[in-house]
Design a protein with these regions (language model features):
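N-terminal auxiliary segments of SAM/dcSAM-dependent transferases
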Residues: 1-36
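A short glycine/serine-rich beta->alpha loop
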Residues: 38, 46-55
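Conserved SAM-binding loop and adjacent beta-strand
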Residues: 51-69
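Conserved SAM/SAH cofactor-binding pocket of Class I
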Residues: 65-127
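Conserved SAM/SAH-binding loop
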Residues: 129-135
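Hydrophobic beta-strand segment of the Class I
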Residues: 143-144
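C-terminal substrate-binding/active-site "lid" region of AdoMet-derived donor-dependent transferases
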Residues: 155-177
């Protein structure tokens, strides 16, 4: 992973703007879905990276963030994981509301960079920025998942782990439409 190259890519193809429905948070977001997909197709293939799901504040993440901002005690003094974080909006909301520990996890290195960049512009310090954590022992009080069960293979991969985390006492919240 080359953070400088990834940051340049994010800066070139997104703009920093407030999130609709959650104006307390600003994110680097694609201004239009088509240009980023077209402009990045070859580059992404060369880097072996997934499409730029991180470049959008998806409704599920916005719903989690809105809930956290409106109900700050939900995250206060908790160890929070934003799983399959994408842009990191849920983690940023947790940081703005006094979470004790904030970790983002995403297998896409561009998403990891986007989370770091988005946290920085929102004056949030991420405690950890992780890649593939599925299967690791649960270390969190609260696991936030924005629309991670949209494909059967992904769901089959993560569901047993999320259930195990819940069985050890973590609260697991999955938002999807």
């Amino acid at each position: 992973m080359n953070p400088a190259l990834f940051q340049k890519f994010i800066s070139d193809y997104t703009i920093l703007k407030e999130v609709d429905f959650v104006p307390e948070i600003s994110l680097y977001q694609a201004s239009d879905i088509t240009p980023i997909w077209q402009a990045t197709e070859n580059w992404l293939a060369e880097q072996n990276i997934e499409p730029p799901f991180w470049a959008f504040a998806w409704p599920e993440g916005k719903a989690l963030a809105r809930y956290i901002i409106d109900h700050p005690r939900f995250v206060k003094q908790k160890k929070v994981l934003d799983f399959a974080a994408g842009c990191g909006i849920a983690a940023i909301a947790a940081g703005k509301n006094n979470a004790q520990f904030i970790e983002v996890a995403d297998i896409d290195p561009l998403a990891q960079q986007a989370c770091a960049s988005n946290a920085k512009v929102n004056h949030i310090l991420l405690d950890k920025n992780s890649k593939n954590i599925v299967g690791l022992p649960c270390q969190w009080d609260l696991i936030l998942c924005g629309d991670v069960c949209y494909e059967t293979p992904m769901t089959r991969h993560i569901w047993p782990w999320l259930k195990k985390c819940a069985a050890t006492g973590a609260q697991v919240i999955i938002s999807w439409t």
